[in-house]
Swiss-Prot record:
Protein name: GTP cyclohydrolase 1
Gene name of the record: folE
Its EC number(s): 3.5.4.16
Positions bound to Zn(2+): 103, 106, 174
NCBIfam families assigned to the protein according to its UniProt record, in alphabetical order: folE, PRK09347.1-2, PRK09347.1-3
Species of origin: Caulobacter vibrioides (strain ATCC 19089 / CIP 103742 / CB 15) (Caulobacter crescentus)
Complexes and interactors: Toroid-shaped homodecamer, composed of two pentamers of five dimers.
Keyword tags: GTP-binding, Hydrolase, Metal-binding, Nucleotide-binding, One-carbon metabolism, Zinc
Substrates-to-products reaction catalysed: GTP + H2O = 7,8-dihydroneopterin 3'-triphosphate + formate + H(+)
Length: 212
């Protein structure tokens, strides 16, 4: 096995809740950097000039951070739960979780906030795990609609929650920096599962807390 083959790894084999992904062979870092140089030249610049000479390396390192969610495992994040909750049986909610993602159509960033609530059935998960769950799905190429469903699916499936509510409010740079060039337009997506879908009073409680 040569060095290039050894450097390649398979990605996409973790929990990909809400996605139909087959494991793919990840190119080497050198191959990824070469692809960035090609795009720089296609844009009309010289990838060998002083200001761009290190850009391919920086872009590849940025991709590692922006798309780290492909290596995250939602099931693992939600696997450790606590049952000693002193009989707590009401809504658990996290408000204003940062969302930093990229759309799958133009790879343009979309930035916003997420609100998550669930109704536990005897066990709860650490609050930081829910924020981490959002980060795992956000750091993948996808649509906001898909991400909203992925988060709801994961909480419903792995926590056996009686109900789940997810709302994401984000601004898409594919709308503001290209195409129609509309600024200050936000997209809101929601998912309600279980009692949050059937109990309109509970659903309204969630929405009121979002607005608070």
């Amino acid at each position: 096995m040569d060095a290039l083959t050894r450097e390649r790894t398979l990605i996409g084999s973790d929990d990909t809740t809400g996605l139909d992904l087959e494991p793919v062979q990840r190119p080497s870092k050198d191959e990824a950097m070469a692809a960035v140089r090609t795009l720089l030249a296609w844009a009309g610049d010289n990838p060998e000039r002083e200001g761009l000479i290190d850009t391919p390396k920086r872009v590849v390192e940025a991709f590692d951070e922006w798309f780290a969610g492909y290596h995250g495992d939602p099931a693992k994040e939600l696997s450790r739960t606590f049952e000693d909750v002193q009989g707590y049986d009401d809504m658990v909610m996290l408000r204003g979780i940062d969302v930093q993602s990229h759309c799958e159509h133009h790879m343009a960033p979309f930035l916003g906030k997420a609100w998550i609530a669930y109704m536990p059935t005897g066990k709860v998960v650490g609050l930081s795990k829910l924020a981490r769950l959002v980060e795992i799905f956000a750091k993948r190429l996808q649509t906001q609609e898909t991400m909203t469903m992925q988060i709801a699916d994961a909480i419903e499936d792995h926590l056996s929650a009686a109900g789940v509510a997810v709302l994401i409010d984000a601004e898409h740079q594919c709308m503001s920096t290209r195409g129609v060039h509309h600024h200050d337009v936000s997209t809101i997506t929601t998912q309600f599962r279980g009692v949050f879908k059937t109990d309109k009073v509970l659903q309204q409680r969630f929405m009121d807390l979002v607005k608070k």
